[in-house]
Amino acid sequence: MSAAMRERFDRFLHEKNCMTDLLAKLEAKTGVNRSFIALGVIGLVALYLVFGYGASLLCNLIGFGYPAYISMKAIESPNKDDDTQWLTYWVVYGVFSIAEFFSDLFLSWFPFYYMLKCGFLLWCMAPSPSNGAELLYRRVIRPIFLKHESQVDSVVKDVKDKAKETADAISKEVKKATVNLLGDEKKST
């Protein structure tokens, strides 16, 4: 590990949160530096993602759990920059999930797939302004979206209008059936 990366990693491990509190307790009880404990845990998770049963679930929990928690905190904060960061992550996560749906049958047979997927998701959620989600959104997803935005808007409007028409028709039929049912009930009493 380069000196700069090691320093950033060490600073990250000394930030105040529940995970670093746990690392501090483990460090105090064992006498082992928290950096080594964290690297050991990372190594075990990586090995589990390669060889473990349920690696898919663990990978999806990592890719969903922390971002969902931080997204809820972002919604509740007055700062809107973090909202944009996490909305960007969820857009990339959604696009990746759709792409993965069609390729998962083949990719899941590769031994390092879930470890690489987990690494990809961690890169996308990295706490930096130029993380993977931002890069992929800016360079891939956004240009495609802007190119097809008007066509997608048109399709969405058509589907929304048809759904409203269908809901109105169903509501009208339910009201009519209710009136008929109540009318038949009054006649029988």
Curated annotation (Swiss-Prot):
Record-linked InterPro entries: TB2_DP1_HVA22 (IPR004345)
Parts of the chain that traverse the membrane: 35-51, 54-74, 85-103, 106-123
Record's keyword annotation contains Membrane: yes
Predominant location: endoplasmic reticulum
Subcellular location: Endoplasmic reticulum membrane; Sarcoplasmic reticulum membrane
KW Transmembrane (keyword) present: yes
Cellular-component GO terms for this entry: endoplasmic reticulum; endoplasmic reticulum tubular network; junctional sarcoplasmic reticulum membrane; sarcoplasmic reticulum membrane
Lumenal side: 52-53, 104-105
GO annotation terms (biological process): endoplasmic reticulum membrane organization
Chain ranges on the Cytoplasmic side, renumbered to this chain: 1-34, 75-84, 124-189
Stretch list, region Required for dimerization and maintaining endoplasmic reticulum morphology: 114-185
One Pfam family recorded for the sequence: TB2_DP1_HVA22
Keywords (A to Z) from UniProt: Endoplasmic reticulum, Membrane, Sarcoplasmic reticulum, Transmembrane, Transmembrane helix
Topology of the protein relative to the lipid bilayer: Multi-pass membrane protein
Entry note about domains: The short lumenal loops between transmembrane domains 1 and 2 and between transmembrane domains 3 and 4 may impart a wedge-like configuration, thus deforming membranes.
Stated family: Belongs to the DP1 family.
The protein's role, per its UniProt record: Plays an essential role in heart function and development by regulating the organization and function of the sarcoplasmic reticulum in cardiomyocytes.
Quaternary organization: Monomer. Homodimer; maybe disulfide-linked. Homotrimer. Interacts with ATL1. Interacts with ATL2. Interacts with ATL3. Interacts with CKAP4. Interacts with RTN4 (isoforms A and B). Interacts with ZFYVE27.
Protein name from the UniProt record: Receptor expression-enhancing protein 5
Taxonomy of the source species: Eukaryota, Metazoa, Chordata, Craniata, Vertebrata
